[in-house]
Every structure is written in C-alpha cells, then in structure tokens.
C-alpha cells in the first residue's frame, strides 16, 4: 500500500515497450513542442526492476451491485451516452490530437535531450501503489470511504524545504483524523504534492507597460519574474521538477512510515500558530477523545504495534498537463501489461484540457492510474457521460473521480443533472467537491483571494445535493497549505482584505491556511456524522 510499511513485493516494472522507445517525433505533432527534425534510432534498455507495494493479484474493484435508479427530472434532457469510436492507443498517440496549454520551447534540441534523460530515469511511483489507491477510491464511490485531497495550487522551487512539506503533511493528518472521527469511515489522504508544478493559463502571453512576454506556467516550465530570461520556457526545469518530486515523495514516505504519523502522536500534530485558536481547542478535544479510545484498546489487550496504528497511507497527485513530461515517465507494468504514468499515483484532467477529441484525454485513456475530471457549471451532462465512457470503458469503480468546481448556487442547479445523467448511464464514479476554483475574486488591493464563507457554502451545497439525490459525497479537493499564510479571507481567525498582503506567498491561486483548513474539516466532519446517524436511524426503522 502507498507509503506504508505493510507492503508486499509482487511484480517488476518492465522497461518501456517498443512503442515507448520510439523517437519522440515518430508521430506528426500539432503543437509547438516538436519540430520535424529526425531523431536517433530506437534504443533497447534493460528492464527496470522495481518493487510494487500492493497485491497485483487483486482485481480492480468493479461494483456488482445494481446502481440506484431515480426518475428522470423534467428538466434533465441527457440522452444515453453515444458509442465511442475506439482507436489503437500508444504512449505517444496524443501527438495526433490537438494539444492545448503546452508551452513553446525555443530550443527543441535541448527539449528532446531532456525528455530522453527523463525517459531513462527511475519511476517516481509504482504501479501497485496506483492500483491500491484505485481500490480505496472504489470504496469512496460506494460511500464507504472519504477522499481528502489537498496541497499547493502550484509547488515552487523557491519554497522547497522539509519544513513546508512536513507542515502540509501534518495538517492533512489532522484533517484526516477529524474526518475519520466524524464520519467513522476510512479517509483516503492524497496530496497535491510531489509533482503539482504546471498550471494552465487563460492567456499564452502577459503584457505589462507595453512589454509582452510568455505567461508564467509553473516552475517546471518558466520563472514568474517578468523578464525575458525568466519567462522563456526552459527544458532543464523539467529535470529539476523531477528531482524535487522524487525528493518530496521520499520525505513523505519517511513521515508516513517512520512513526511521525502514528495515531499515538495525534496530540503532537498541532501546528504552533493554531495552538491557541478555536480550531486548535476543538482539535485538542478530539485528540483527547482518541487518546482515551487508544488507552481503552490497550487496556483490553489490543496491541498498538500493528502497522495500521504506526503508519498511514498517503498518495500523490497532480494535474496531467505537460504531456511530453508525462509520456517520459510512463512505464509498462510487467505484471498487468498496462501502462502507468509513474509521475504520480493519481492524475486529473483540467477544465481547459478535457476536450473529448483532445490530446490530454487521448493520453489519459491509455494509462491505468486512477483519474480525476475537473467539472464546472459549463459541463453538459451528456458530454460528461461520454468522457467517462472514453476514460473508463470497463466501468471500474475507483477509476474515475469527478471533481466539481461550480460555486454554491451553480452547484445546487447544475450538479443534480450531472449525477442523474451518470446514474442513468450506469457509470460508477467518485463525486468530489473542489470548493476553491469557483470562488476566486479580486480584492480591492488587486490580489486574488477566496472568501471562506463562499468555500463553506459550496461544501454545504455539495452535501445537500447528494442528500437530495441519494448519491454519495465522496471527498473534497482543496488548495491549502500548512503555512500561516493570509491568502483566503474569512474564517474564525478572520483574515481581512487588509491582511492579505502581510503573508501572501502563493505563486498562483490563493490557498487556505492551516487554521482555515482545519475549520473546514470540522464542518465536513459534522456533515459526515449527520449522514452516518441518519443512515443508522433509517436502518433501525
């Protein structure tokens, strides 16, 4: 299991298939990543032996339970999903499709050299870990687990240090404990970490004082300083991003399995600046109750030495955006014969790149990682059904997570139609709320921010809609940090517009700080508790 000591060795990661070792220019390109220069002949490399940490003999979860039916709503006009024309997939077949949001590298030869180097690097994650996560997400789809996915909007090279990684991991541990206690169900902890660098942009260029330069697309592409050198896409940044991702994951593994995440340490996870806050007080009260329960278990003769009490499972995720990099880290698993993108356990396709005939969907349909689909109020129900069919033709539970980002009012109007369309198609998905992206505003000072009240309202709308539709609220997806930043306004320790500039450190979008994140987790835990008690009372009738 991911980042856990109770793992089993089960298979080897083979070297890439012949298709994968073909030159990067073997298919015509429709984007500026590639030129028409010839490349070297195919290389044959010895297979890479890598330990998988989950049981490869387990089949992915496929629900054998009939899905709930609901009468069609008068306003929902979704037709059955049309048949999808299948073409043969290859690791580079995305190049035959239109690829959006890719930077233009001026030095194509250097780009090819860098991608070849990354192609020969070891995988960052293992296929067995991704399969294990898919199984857990399958449980969330059935209402038997809850996904907590969070981390930076975009990781940066400048803020890369052990303390920042530890603090984000620690607040996720705290939030996971709160959610698990309230929901009385497993919490699947997935970080937007160890690879969340690239960001899509509304415009390819940015103009200031008559100077027009390429937009900042994340530290793995270019720099955020507004000068020609910084804004020119640099292939060497891809290698630095790989190294930082590997180092981040290495530290996360140590935290998850080295005793730091042991449940007995629950009272020690409080961050210093939340210690004397309302949320810190609530957390200490919860931690004391957990301590009492652990003491009772010890007195009853139940051992605290079991790995489940000493370690935690933790997975990584990022948006699948920079396709040449993702291709270079794709490996064929020798056990299953399937391809896995070994840059992360979980990848998602964004609002700007989820076109049915686009390059990103083409790439993702061929990899076996669990996938997310970001969905706004602009998503047509029939298009969502077709996209799910393309990405999950076998209808495996845990394969697809729908991450909704709409704003509270749009959520109440639009989400029911999406749920009904997916249900009518018989598709199994995990429904998750992203209450961040639909609530971004500009403060009077010009900085982007997000009101905590709006974030809370969207989370409540998400739960209300699922209560109404009889479906399962499967998780939450947050842009957050363990640092004491002032980027989102509101919360119990009220951050005002005037406070924003004091600790506004984000490289992209505003994040919840640790106190706001913990406060939101208590709100979600209360909704999970009410659902649990309501379900129990229904069973008792």
Swiss-Prot record:
The keyword Transferase applies. It is found in: Plastid, Chloroplast. Highest levels seen in the roots and lower levels seen in the stems and flowers. Is undetectable in the leaves and cotyledons. Pathway: Metabolic intermediate biosynthesis; chorismate biosynthesis; chorismate from D-erythrose 4-phosphate and phosphoenolpyruvate: step 1/7. Residues 54-81 are annotated as: Disordered. Keywords: Amino-acid biosynthesis, Aromatic amino acid biosynthesis, Chloroplast, Plastid, Transferase, Transit peptide. One of its GO terms (molecular function) is 3-deoxy-7-phosphoheptulonate synthase activity. It comes from Solanum lycopersicum. One of its GO terms (cellular component) is chloroplast. It comes from the Eukaryota. It catalyses: D-erythrose 4-phosphate + phosphoenolpyruvate + H2O = 7-phospho-2-dehydro-3-deoxy-D-arabino-heptonate + phosphate. This is Phospho-2-dehydro-3-deoxyheptonate aldolase 2, chloroplastic. Residues 68-81 have a biased composition (Low complexity). It is an enzyme of class 2 (transferase). GO terms for biological process: amino acid biosynthetic process; aromatic amino acid family biosynthetic process; chorismate biosynthetic process. Involved in maintaining the supply of chorismate for the biosynthesis of the aromatic amino acids and other chorismate-derived metabolites. Its EC number is 2.5.1.54. Residues 1-74 form a transit peptide. It holds the Pfam family DAHP_synth_2. Belongs to the class-II DAHP synthase family. Its main location: plastid.
């Amino acid at each position: 299991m991911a980042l856990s000591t109770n793992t089993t060795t089960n298979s080897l990661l083979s070297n890439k298939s012949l298709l994968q070792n073909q030159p990067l220019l073997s298919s015509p390109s429709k984007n500026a990543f590639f030129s028409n220069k010839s490349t070297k002949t195919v290389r044959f490399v010895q297979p890479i032996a890598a330990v998988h940490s989950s049981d490869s003999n387990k089949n992915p979860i496929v629900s054998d339970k009939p899905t709930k039916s609901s009468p069609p709503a008068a306003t929902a006009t979704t037709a059955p999903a049309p048949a999808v024309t299948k073409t043969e997939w290859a690791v580079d077949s995305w190049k035959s499709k239109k690829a959006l949001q890719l930077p233009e590298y001026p030095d194509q030869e250097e780009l090819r050299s860098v991608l070849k180097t990354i192609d020969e690097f070891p995988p960052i994650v293992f296929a067995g870990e991704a399969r294990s996560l898919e199984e857990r997400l399958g449980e969330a789809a059935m209402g038997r687990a809850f996904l907590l996915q969070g981390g930076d909007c975009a990781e940066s090279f400048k803020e890369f240090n052990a303390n920042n990684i530890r603090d984000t991991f620690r607040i996720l541990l705290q939030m996971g404990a709160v959610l698990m206690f309230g929901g009385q169900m497993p919490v699947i902890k997935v970080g937007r970490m160890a690879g969340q660098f690239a960001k899509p942009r509304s415009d390819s260029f940015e103009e200031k004082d008559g100077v027009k330069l390429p937009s900042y697309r994340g530290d793995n592409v270019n720099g955020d300083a507004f000068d020609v050198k910084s804004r020119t896409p640099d292939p060497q940044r891809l290698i630095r991003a790989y190294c930082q991702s590997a180092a981040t994951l290495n530290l996360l593994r140590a935290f998850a399995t080295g005793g730091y995440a042991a449940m007995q340490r629950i009272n020690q996870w409080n961050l210093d600046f939340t210690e004397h806050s309302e949320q810190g007080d609530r957390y200490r009260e919860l931690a004391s109750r957990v301590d009492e329960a652990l003491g009772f278990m010890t007195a009853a003769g139940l051992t605290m030495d079991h790995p489940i009490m000493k370690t935690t499972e933790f997975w990584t995720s990022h948006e699948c955006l920079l396709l040449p990099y993702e291709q270079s880290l794709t490996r064929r698993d020798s056990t299953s014969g399937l391809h896995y993108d070994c840059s992360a356990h979980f990848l998602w396709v964004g609002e700007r790149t989820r076109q049915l005939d686009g390059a990103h969907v083409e790439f993702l349909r061929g990899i076996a990682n669990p996938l997310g689909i970001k969905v706004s109020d602009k998503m047509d129900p029939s298009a969502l059904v077709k996209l799910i069919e393309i990405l999950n033709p076998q209808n495996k539970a845990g394969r697809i997570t729908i991450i909704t980002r709409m704003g509270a009012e749009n959520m109440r109007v639009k989400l029911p139609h999406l749920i009904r369309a997916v249900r009518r198609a018989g598709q199994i998905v995990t429904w998750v709320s992203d209450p961040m992206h639909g609530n971004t505003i500009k403060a009077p000072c010009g900085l982007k921010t997000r009101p905590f009240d709006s974030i809370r309202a969207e989370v409540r709308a998400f739960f209300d809609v699922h209560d109404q539709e009889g479906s399962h609220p499967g998780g939450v997806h947050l842009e957050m940090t363990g640092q004491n930043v002032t980027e989102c306004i509101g919360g119990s320790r009220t951050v005002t517009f005037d406070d924003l500039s004091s600790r506004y450190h984000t490289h992209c979008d505003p994040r919840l700080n640790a106190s706001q994140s913990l406060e939101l987790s208590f709100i979600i835990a209360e909704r999970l508790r009410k659902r649990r008690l309501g379900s129990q009372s229904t069973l008792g009738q």
